[in-house]
Amino acid sequence: MGKITRRTREAKKKQRQPIVKVCLSYPIIPQVEEGEVIDIVHERSRGAPVAIISFKEDDCMVPASEGMYTGQKILIGDDAPIDIGNITKIKNVPEGMAVNSVESVYGDGGTFAMVNGSYSLVVNHRKETNETVIKIPSGKKLTVSSECRCIVGVVAGGGIHDKPLLKASVAHYKAKARGHVFPRVRGVAMNPVEHIHGGGNHQHVGKPTTVSKKDISQEQKIGLVGARRTGYRVGSRKL
């Protein structure tokens, strides 16, 4: 075990607060109702802008779609027309169209494709079983009920990853907003007295990185902790 460096000792005095995100969802309104986008705001630790939509009874916050603007009229309901920002049932959306904030269960307010630049594609509708196949951002195809609702369009803020950080202070505040630690020094870049991966003529671990759970301390970057196996699985697996 390596010794605790000065920077690590200082960091242990501070408590990193967990990030608290506002739950984004839209209400259950069966009949077609008109709302208005009263504001588009930024939330800390969230890449996508948040649109505040005002309806007759209550306001809701949803991920802003590309092309949404302040003062835009939004229609919500089971039979709402297909337009950017409208909230309707997924069975009304044509095949091949991009949607976001897709519900996994009717009434949950949105589960899939809610981060910046993400969207789900409607693959096909199965009318005999009242189900719809969608392709989520990970590339996996899922089957949801055709009664689930969604927002038409692509979530805004897709170009946030194309913007370079340019300097370390920007990366520092980005990590701070998300409750992360920056910078994190690799173990192979340290000296042998500071980390078990340190030392050597060049940066190479040079020893097994799989360690027991008893040999590590909290929040220590040590390698593969208590791993049963490492590497790719070779050969067929017998059941």
From Swiss-Prot:
SMART domains with a match to the protein in the record: Ribosomal_L2, Ribosomal_L2_C
Keyword RNA-binding attributed: yes
GO terms, molecular function: rRNA binding; structural constituent of ribosome
Covalent S-S links between cysteines: none
Keywords assigned: Cytoplasm, Ribonucleoprotein, Ribosomal protein, RNA-binding, rRNA-binding
Compartments in which it is found: Cytoplasm
Principal cellular location given in the protein's record: cytoplasm
GO biological process: cytoplasmic translation
Transmembrane segments: none
GO CC annotation, single: cytosolic large ribosomal subunit
One Pfam short name: Ribosomal_L2_C
Family: Belongs to the universal ribosomal protein uL2 family.
Protein name per UniProt: Large ribosomal subunit protein uL2
